[in-house]
């Protein structure tokens, strides 16, 4: 519990979403609930574009709130 609110986990499966994932993330980030009360779990399903690089970058930028995972073949 943070600031009297329950923490919410947002799970986003990803496959070749390099073009769209930032728009999705920005939408989550701007929610009135407060980003500090969110845990965003991004799961890359072996994308063939640069999705994984974007997810890693988000995790580095927001280490307290973002977890990036990559499925294994």
Which residues fall in each region the model found?
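A conserved acidic beta->alpha catalytic loop
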Residues: 44-53, 73
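Generic preference for flexible, low-structure residues
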Residues: 24-26, 37, 44, 56
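Short loop->beta transition adjacent to catalytic acidic/histidine clusters or analogous donor-positioning motifs
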Residues: 5-8, 29-42, 50, 63-67
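N-proximal low-complexity "stem/linker" segments adjacent to membrane-targeting elements
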Residues: 1-30
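Acidic helix N-cap motif at the loop->helix transition within catalytic regions
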Residues: 22, 49-58
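Short loop/edge segments at beta-strand edges and connector loops
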Residues: 70
């Amino acid at each position: 519990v943070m600031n009297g609110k329950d923490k919410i986990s947002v799970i986003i499966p990803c496959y070749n979403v390099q073009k769209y994932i930032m728009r999705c993330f920005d939408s989550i980030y701007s929610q009135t609930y407060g980003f500090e009360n969110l845990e965003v779990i991004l799961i890359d399903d072996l994308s063939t574009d640069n999705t994984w690089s974007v997810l890693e970058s988000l995790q580095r930028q927001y280490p307290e709130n973002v977890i990036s995972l990559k499925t294994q073949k």
